[in-house]
Swiss-Prot record:
It is found in: Plastid, Chloroplast. It comes from the Eukaryota. This is Uncharacterized protein ORF621. Its main location: plastid. The lineage of its organism: Eukaryota, Rhodophyta, Bangiophyceae, Bangiales, Bangiaceae.
């Protein structure tokens, strides 16, 4: 005989959720529309703790992605069972303690007017703390050597766990400091020997013998070239290989070779004078003076945080003066002097709309004066048919050309980045647009090609990071990182804007129409919380359109003639690496990569992926 057990189950649903109260919602950073989208589908249904927890996690994520990483969500039960009260704590700062130390980490007391540094950091009592903004501003102060180092610690307040106590330890640098600079550079010896041999061949091939009745031998049949060329090592090697392949004698290029040979060994000595803590605004001034071979470079940089009206605004100003002269000494037949003077005024304006989006404008005023003097001495012989005598005479000529350029350059940059390379794992997007506008002044020596000297350049770079839905140990996700960079330079003529230690390269040159794209794909395989293996592939494709359709060759490794189409247009590399997260605070991940290039070269790189 069977017995039946009967159990009664009573289901008591949660109360219907009718109202959600958010404390001080008008004063919160999070948009009201965002909160409505989270909770509107839960109104009118029984309370679901799973859905509520999902909504709370979205609120925390919204704050965390924007740098407010100390935010909390507190849920309170209202007197009415059908209502709940949500209090969003945004990580408000309650107390700030600032300590100053010397370079030897000795406590400094009695520092006056330190509010400018503290105000620039953007940390205020009663305001939410943004870690991303704070780290960017600390990096700016350190990079511009306004401070030595800034160490900060954040703790929840003992009296109120929803508030924060922050402590800064700022390392003061010396008010006056002088640093001596010394550099030496040279090119490889076999390249220098090759250039010397070709230079001698140019000289020997230009001894011209005319008819016997009028014997006229001129050692150098020189013609001035009024088209300046952009001078650097790679361009001269291309020119050298091109002239040899075409079997042409190019005496004009002798001077380019001579300039390169004389600059193969260049020693630089100089000093930098740092003046800090000027006046009451913690102003900072750097005087840099470098004595390059046959030249002088002076640069003055001034930064004053107290001039910043808004804490999201950055301003810098610099003045640079360059003076360089060069004397070439070939055989005693002629002598060339190249003098260059340059004055540059540079300012940088940057404004951060949010912790992720910023805009910057770099303004550059430049005046360059280039003096090219040629002292030419030739010995001439004249055969007289009537007297059967040979008459000789010397000819000394001086030809001086002054070429100057004055122009205004505006560099506009738009930047969006919602992640930092300090994060682990890396997630987010990076997008950047740059536009360079260059315009010469009317009184410059550009009358023949003034309309073609306006220079526009656009470059875009995007970094996207995705977590693949493939889990490994401890729920660590595989990560795919894609980097795409496009750059265009659509101009027929331009002016070099290279602010380097060799101002002799500030010359007018004909450029090319080009468009390039660079792609980098990375796949990370997590092995632990601190180690990831990576596979990567790099691809570079350049599209070149030259004004001259003639085939130009270059020397690859100074031995093999290779068409420029094969050498420049496409390159790729691939390899594997390991990425380490070191247990050092504020240290980005460190990567060791083994790379194989398209030319079958093997390289090992040590990289840190940190970008502001």
């Amino acid at each position: 005989m069977y017995k039946k057990n009967i159990s009664n189950i009573f289901l008591l649903p949660n109360d219907i959720l009718k109202r959600i109260y958010i404390c001080n919602k008008k004063k919160k950073l999070i948009p009201h529309s965002f909160l409505i989208n989270l909770f509107q589908k839960q109104i009118g249904y029984p309370k679901s703790f799973a859905n509520l927890n999902w909504a709370f996690s979205k609120i925390i994520k919204w704050y965390y992605d924007r740098g407010y990483q100390w935010s909390l969500v507190e849920v309170k039960q209202a007197s009415d069972a059908s209502s709940i009260v949500i209090d969003i704590h945004e990580g408000v700062v309650k107390t700030i303690i600032t300590e100053y130390y010397t370079l030897s980490y000795k406590r400094v007391s009695g520092i006056l007017c330190v509010e400018s540094i503290e105000q620039y950091l953007g940390v205020r009592v009663g305001a939410p703390l943004n870690i991303i903004d704070l780290q960017k501003k600390i990096t700016y102060l350190k990079d511009n050597q306004l401070v030595g180092d800034i160490i900060y610690s954040i703790e929840r307040s003992n009296n109120s766990s929803m508030s924060l106590d922050i402590k800064f330890q700022i390392q003061e640098l010396k008010d006056k400091e002088i640093i001596v600079l010394a550099e030496s550079s040279s090119i490889i010896s076999h390249a220098c020997n090759l250039l010397n041999q070709y230079r001698n061949r140019l000289v020997a091939s230009n001894i011209v013998s005319l008819s016997t009745n009028k014997l006229h031998a001129c050692y150098f049949n020189y013609k001035l070239d009024y088209q300046y060329k952009y001078i650097n090592t790679s361009n001269l090697i291309k020119l050298l290989a091109y002239s040899i392949s075409c079997r042409k004698t190019l005496l004009i290029h002798y001077f380019n070779l001579q300039t390169l040979i004389s600059c193969t060994k260049k020693n630089t000595i100089g000093f930098q004078l740092y003046l800090r803590n000027l006046s009451f605004g913690k102003a900072f001034c750097v005087l840099s003076m470098k004595f390059i071979k046959n030249g002088l470079n002076i640069k003055i940089l001034y930064i004053n945080p107290s001039l910043i009206v808004d804490q999201n605004f950055v301003f810098q100003f610099a003045i640079q003066i360059i003076k360089q002269y060069h004397t070439a000494k070939p055989p005693a037949l002629f002598l060339t002097n190249l003098d260059l003077e340059q004055y540059v005024a540079e300012s940088l304006l940057m404004y951060h709309f949010t912790s992720c989006f910023s805009i910057s404008e770099k303004i550059l005023l430049s005046r360059i004066m280039h003096t090219d003097s040629l002292f030419f001495n030739s010995e001439n012989f004249h055969f007289d048919d009537r007297t059967n005598a040979i008459n000789s005479y010397d000819t000394f000529k001086q030809n001086t050309k002054i070429f100057y350029q004055e122009f205004l350059s505006l560099l506009l940059s738009l930047r969006y980045q919602n992640f930092t390379y300090l994060g682990w794992p890396l997630k987010g997007h990076f997008f950047e647009i740059k536009s360079l506008y260059l315009a010469p002044f009317q009184k410059s020596d550009f009358s023949d090609s003034r309309k073609t000297l306006f220079f526009h350049k656009m470059s875009l770079k995007q970094v996207s990071n995705f977590n693949l839905p493939v889990s490994f140990k401890s729920h660590l996700n595989h990560i795919l990182v894609s980097t795409i960079k496009c750059q265009s330079n659509l101009n027929m003529r331009t002016v070099s804007l290279l602010l380097i230690d060799s101002p002799a390269e500030y010359l007018l040159y004909k450029s090319i129409l080009n468009f390039s794209i660079k792609v980098r794909m990375q796949y990370f395989i997590p092995m632990s919380n601190n180690i990831r293996l990576s596979l990567f592939y790099n691809y570079l494709d350049c599209f070149l359109i030259r004004s001259s359709q003639s085939c130009i060759h270059i020397w690859q490794d100074l031995r093999t003639l290779t068409p420029i189409q094969n050498f420049w247009l496409k390159k790729f590399s691939y390899g594997a690496g390991i990425q380490l997260k070191l247990p050092i605070k504020q240290m980005p991940p460190l990567s060791i990569e083994y790379t194989v290039t398209s030319s079958r070269y093997f390289c090992i790189y040590l990289r840190t992926y940190y970008q502001r």
